[in-house]
């Protein structure tokens, strides 16, 4: 069992990119298994911030093989821009990155349909990133998608034109103005960039390499509470963000899975619409947002902020089979005199520990813990952390039954405590 999974346990933005980069030296292969450019994995290396949307976070390690799996949806225009912004030459990056033939493409029509759908919902918008993710996955499930392997066909342009005709026909049902020509030109430039990379049947490659002992880390995008089945539906993404998605998104057997690493923030954030029981619409919420620089890596939208939600965290741990917890953003809580943790909900006058099926109004039940004043960004040993922070972590461990083995104390890859 030399395949491990790393994923988010909240509503995304937990710090997956930084942690993947930090633990990449332990692996030979880093593979994305779902999502698309709606993801924004931020990592800071030598005080330089990088944001990855499609490319696995192991790309900054020259000796690692990075794979975009079949469960990912790829926007060629975004892919091209991301490759050009990375730093290393395209020739060098072609040695580090491989793409699945089965990964579906996000077409220009998908982006326009996404915007048209969201615009038509008015006040009932779900908070789409407008990247074409939903329509691309819709076409995939309807068996009407274009896949990366098809860009190598001689009749690819004809295939594309058929899809565009279908999308334009759908758009006639909406009172929505759009322009496609300029984006389409950039999209085809992205197709040319994709052709420079190896596009192969990655399910065979992954099973062959891991069968020979190579270690693989499957990198999730978004978070458990945005999962299409188990998230706060309909305010969710269009893919399975949970650990089971790694099997279908890479072509690996469940019996090959070893560890499942779950990342959570020391508090909670959410972008877009949808239920958020511990949301703070006050000065404390604003303080968390400003101190934590809580603005979306993909959209730039301000994130909604709130206290840690333990029932939601325990739900995510259960669904994913998490074996180890990694906590980020503990440094942002420095300076708070008291810190609240949601340990249950109150609905219709009754207390409960389970997340309700419907998106009804629920009131969080809090436990208060003492805060800490110290700046922890320079600390590299767990036992040197403030006592109250260690107690906070112990409280989470006691409540969840899972050990916290990594504590992030800052944005840079070096600002990480590996706890033995």
Question: In which residue ranges do the predicted regions lie?
Answer:
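Non-transmembrane, aqueous-exposed alpha-helical and coiled segments at domain scale
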Residues: 1-420
């Amino acid at each position: 069992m030399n395949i491990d999974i790393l994923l988010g346990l909240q509503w995304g933005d937990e710090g997956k990119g930084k942690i993947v980069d930090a633990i990449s030296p332990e692996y030979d292969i880093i593979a994305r298994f779902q999502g698309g450019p709606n993801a924004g994995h931020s990592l800071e290396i030598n005080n330089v911030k990088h944001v990855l949307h499609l490319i696995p976070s192991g790309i900054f390690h020259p000796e690692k093989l990075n794979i975009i799996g079949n469960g990912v949806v790829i926007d060629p225009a975004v892919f091209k821009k991301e490759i050009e912004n990375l730093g290393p030459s395209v020739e060098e990056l072609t040695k580090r990155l491989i793409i699945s033939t089965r990964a579906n493409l996000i077409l220009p029509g998908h982006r326009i349909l996404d915007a048209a759908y969201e615009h038509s919902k008015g006040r009932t918008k779900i908070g789409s990133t407008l990247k074409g993710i939903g329509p691309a996955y819709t076409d995939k499930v309807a068996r009407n998608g274009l896949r990366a392997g098809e860009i190598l066909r001689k009749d690819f342009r004809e295939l594309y034109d058929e899809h565009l005709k279908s999308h334009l026909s759908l758009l006639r049902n909406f009172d929505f103005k759009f322009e496609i020509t300029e984006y389409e030109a950039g999209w085809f430039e992205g197709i040319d960039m994709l052709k420079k990379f190896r596009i192969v049947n990655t399910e065979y490659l992954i099973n062959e390499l891991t069968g020979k002992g190579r270690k693989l880390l499957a990198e999730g995008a978004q978070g458990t509470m945005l999962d299409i089945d188990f998230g706060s539906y309909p305010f969710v993404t269009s893919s399975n963000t949970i650990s089971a998605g790694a099997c279908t998104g890479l072509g690996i057997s469940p019996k090959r899975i070893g560890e499942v690493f779950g990342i959570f923030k020391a508090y909670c954030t959410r972008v877009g619409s949808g239920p958020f029981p511990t949301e703070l619409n006050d000065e404390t919420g604003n303080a968390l947002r400003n101190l934590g620089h809580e603005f979306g890596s993909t959209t730039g939208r301000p994130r909604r902020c709130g206290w840690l939600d333990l029932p939601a965290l325990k739900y995510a741990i259960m669904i994913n089979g998490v074996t180890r917890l990694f906590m980020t953003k503990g440094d942002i809580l420095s300076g708070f005199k008291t810190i609240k943790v949601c340990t249950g909900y109150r609905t219709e006058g009754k207390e409960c520990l389970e997340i309700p099926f419907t998106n009804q109004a629920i009131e969080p039940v809090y436990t208060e813990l003492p805060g800490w004043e110290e700046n922890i960004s320079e600390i590299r040993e767990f036992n040197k952390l403030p006592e109250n922070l260690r107690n906070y972590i112990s409280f989470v461990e006691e409540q969840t039954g899972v050990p916290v083995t990594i504590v992030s104390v800052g944005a840079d890859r070096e600002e990480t405590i590996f706890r033995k």
